């Protein structure tokens, strides 16, 4: 997995370098500090810094939904975005129905497949998603892909973020 991530980071760096006319700074949406998106963005920045042909400024954001919004508003030049979030934003679907379709961006490379896990304490009385009703649940930072995916999962079970604490 680490070799694949390193290869994808190198590929993205090459692609970003080919987009720059030199001298300009690429604003790169990196999500929250400490996460894999932030680590990947900073690795891309390090490779570009070592090469010296491209200046990348990583921007800490809430995550995928914020990144796609900031790309469409031209605040970011590049970002890491979950593919399902990019799809929904482009088509104005699911969590983007109210805001409508967002555009002004395109996919460059797939980095990795993401899984969503629901994890509880071993001694918990939670055995299914239905058991989350009335419980304290972390659904992720606002405008993150985690938040949007959590809301989709809860909705599929007839729950919403107001039904959990």
Segments the model singles out, each with a brief description of its role:
Residues 62-64, 74-75, 80-94, 143:
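Beta->alpha turn/N-cap motifs
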Residues 97-111, 116:
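A structural signal for short loop-to-beta-strand junctions that line the ligand-binding cleft
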Residues 42, 65-76, 152:
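Short helices/loops that flank or line small-molecule/ion binding pockets
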Residues 23-50, 114-165:
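Bilobed "Venus flytrap"/periplasmic-binding protein-like clamshell domains
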Residues 52-56:
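A generic structural motif
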Residues 34, 58-69, 160-165:
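Short helix-initiation/N-cap motifs at beta->coil->alpha
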Residues 15-18:
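C-terminal motif of bacterial Sec signal peptides marking the signal peptidase cleavage site
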Residues 1-9:
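Positively charged n-region of N-terminal signal peptides that target proteins for export
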């Amino acid at each position: 997995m680490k070799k694949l991530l390193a290869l994808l980071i190198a590929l993205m760096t090459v692609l970003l370098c080919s987009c720059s006319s030199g001298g300009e700074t690429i604003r790169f949406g990196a999500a929250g500090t400490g996460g894999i998106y932030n680590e990947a963005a900073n690795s891309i920045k390090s490779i570009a810094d070592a090469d010296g042909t491209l200046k990348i400024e990583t921007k800490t954001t809430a995550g995928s939904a914020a990144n796609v919004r900031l790309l469409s508003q031209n605040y970011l030049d590049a970002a890491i975005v979950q593919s399902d979030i990019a799809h929904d934003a482009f088509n104005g679907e699911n969590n983007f129905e109210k805001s409508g379709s967002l555009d002004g961006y395109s996919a460059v490379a797939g980095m990795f497949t993401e899984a969503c896990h629901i994890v509880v304490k071993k001694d918990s009385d939670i055995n299914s998603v239905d058991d989350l009703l009335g419980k304290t649940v972390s659904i992720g930072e606002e405008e993150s892909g985690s938040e949007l995916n959590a809301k989709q999962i809860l909705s599929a079970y007839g729950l919403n973020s107001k039904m959990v604490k």
